[in-house]
Amino acid sequence: MYWTKSKGTGGSVLKEENFVVEEIPSRKFFMKYSRLAGGIKEVQGPYTLALLRKKGITTKDAVKFIQMKFNLKKDGIGYAGLKDKFAVTTQYITIKGEIKDFKTDRIDLTKIGYTDKMMQVGELIGNKFTITLRNCKNPQNMAVMEEIKKRAMPNYFGPQRFGSHGDNHEVGRLILRNEYEKVLDLINKRGYNKNLDEISKKTLKFFIHAYQSFLFNKILDTYVSKYSKPSFEEFPLVGYDTKLKNDFASRQLKKVLEKDKISINNFSIRCLGLRCNGSSRSAFVKVGELNYKIEGNSIILTFTLPKGSYATTLLKEITKNVP
């Protein structure tokens, strides 16, 4: 199912260097001076601000490597967002303590200065992308680009959200239904051999978040199939604190939850000590600074997306490779 009506270009990302991501962090980490009661003073702080460039490694694995190299505590590094493994990515991190610049074949860390704030997840504005699509069947089909500029983009969660097996949401659904034997069957098929009490709360919550994302995508699917104008409302990411209304998103959510035999109260699981209160997410987002250049049967795309939005969703609309 596609939101745009124009024909796709085809094409694919063939290697990491064809998918470049630059994080746009919160400006507060770059303030060199601050206004205090005693006047304007230069910012000093216990945190080192550094630029992390990486390729072929996840943000979490890169952070673990840096922690080991500089003998840092587990919570000694802060970052705003997680970047994919199959990409060349740039992001800022904060480090409690001193570091030296270093470079490997996958990680390049450069010290920028100091800050008085520890970076937290979510403290970014968005991301800038430079993506090269190779072997495009119809590189001249640029009408789809103009359509996206005018009509915005459905803010689907990308496939990364659902794990390499594509079934993280199914594990989450089973957790919420208290079907713990089935949960263990699914998890242990991946090569593990664990009991439920050996799985961290963080991991269990991760599966529930995948189910929340699955529900959001289902609601958005229904909207895209019914309407031609984008909705710039927020759709629910359901949790125990979600207040269902008599609007489109709430009605669709009720239908899916009833089908899955799950209630709002299921998102608070006392026996596991898990509580997911829920939140909301923009149904559609504007694609910023979308530009393109055709080189033979390749297309070079540049654009920005707000935090939490997936470039893979945009690529699906442009290429129309996925039925």
Q: How would you label these PLM feature ranges?
A:
Residues 313:
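Classical protein tyrosine phosphatase
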Residues 1-40, 47, 55-60, 65, ...:
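Extended, charged/glycine-rich binding lobes that contact polyanionic ligands
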